[in-house]
């Protein structure tokens, strides 16, 4: 069933305290609105709980449990994160609501005024190495913060990174809706028979292997961060092609080595190109794993 975001007027009927509601975007089963709430502008998020009518009660309960569990996990992680490189929760506490006979969970995050990397890529922006290093450092700090909580983001991609164009807080990582906690009970219902949650173009190769959850760690986020930086720098994804079907894309992720970033951006330093290339290795053990050392080298402009 296609997700239709609730109308702005519908939201105002439930949240009468909003002085202004403006739809921003939607993806998956989530919609985001810019609202004027208690403390000024906030990003109001409304997440649809899938309908399960016509499904066996036991399966229906598991699907609902997974959906609500992911929302609760995301909110808990955001509440625990202190890094400015990760989006913050807003003032509106989670609330289950019914709109047009559909069930949602609604809450807010801080409103971030900027552009996603996806928008900048579409504008054919060619970032400088200084800009790319700043992005690199921000993503590494976000990954480090999440891993300190035993969490893997699992969906780092250009759509989920915001450029605020501020010296004190240049890039921010968004959307922890499918974050994975190695210390929690797995949420995915019937996970052995489903592809892993995530955006397939940005999946690390190991996530396509049987039993991947048992050995998953922050190096999967390292891989996805490198893909994101590569695509922003080069203006194109190193493996996925726009006309590919899902199977072709997944096959490239597992089997094909990407071209060096240097083939598209020879103006970048050998250290920067080499580090991104190394982060895109198929085997996690071959990727750089000392985040603090990487940040130190990037900050010192090695």
Regions found by a protein language model. Give the residues of each.
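Conserved short submotifs of the Hanks-type protein kinase catalytic core
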Residues: 99-116
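AlphaC helix of the eukaryotic protein kinase fold
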Residues: 58-80
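Activation segment signature within eukaryotic-like protein kinase domains
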Residues: 135-136
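Conserved activation segment of eukaryotic-like protein kinases, specifically the C-terminal portion
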Residues: 191-207
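Conserved HxN/HPN-centered segment at the entrance to the catalytic loop
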Residues: 82-93
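AlphaC helix of the protein kinase catalytic domain
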Residues: 116-127
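Catalytic-loop of the protein kinase fold
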Residues: 147-164
């Amino acid at each position: 069933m296609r997700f239709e975001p609730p109308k702005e007027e519908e939201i105002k009927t439930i949240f009468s305290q909003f002085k202004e509601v403006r739809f921003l975007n939607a993806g998956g089963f989530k919609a985001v609105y810019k609202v004027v709430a208690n403390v000024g502008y906030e990003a109001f998020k409304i997440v649809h709980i899938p309908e399960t009518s016509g499904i066996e009660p036991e399966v229906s309960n598991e699907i609902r449990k997974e959906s609500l569990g992911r929302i609760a996990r995301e909110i808990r992680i955001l509440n625990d994160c202190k890094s400015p490189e990760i989006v913050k929760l807003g003032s509106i506490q989670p609330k289950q609501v019914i709109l047009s006979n559909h069930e949602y969970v609604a809450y807010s995050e801080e409103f971030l005024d900027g552009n996603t990397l996806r928008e900048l890529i579409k504008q054919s922006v060619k970032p400088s190495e200084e800009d790319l290093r700043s992005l690199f450092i921000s993503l590494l700090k976000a990954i480090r913060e999440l891993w300190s909580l035993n969490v893997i983001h699992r969906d780092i991609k250009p759509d989920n990174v915001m450029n605020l164009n501020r010296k004190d807080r240049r890039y921010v990582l968004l959307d922890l809706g499918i974050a994975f906690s190695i210390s929690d009970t797995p949420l995915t219902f019937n996970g052995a028979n489903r592809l892993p949650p995530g955006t397939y173009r940005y999946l690390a190769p190991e996530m396509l292997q049987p039993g991947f959850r048992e050995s998953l760690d922050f190096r999967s986020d390292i891989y996805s961060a490198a893909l994101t930086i590569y695509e922003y720098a080069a203006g194109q994804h190193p493996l996925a092609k726009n006309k590919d079907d899902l199977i072709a894309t997944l096959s490239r992720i597992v089997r094909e080595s990407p071209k060096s970033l240097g083939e598209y951006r020879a103006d970048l330093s050998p250290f920067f190109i080499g580090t991104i290339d190394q982060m895109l290795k198929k085997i996690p053990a071959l990727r750089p794993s000392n985040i603090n050392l990487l940040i130190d080298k990037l900050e010192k402009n090695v």
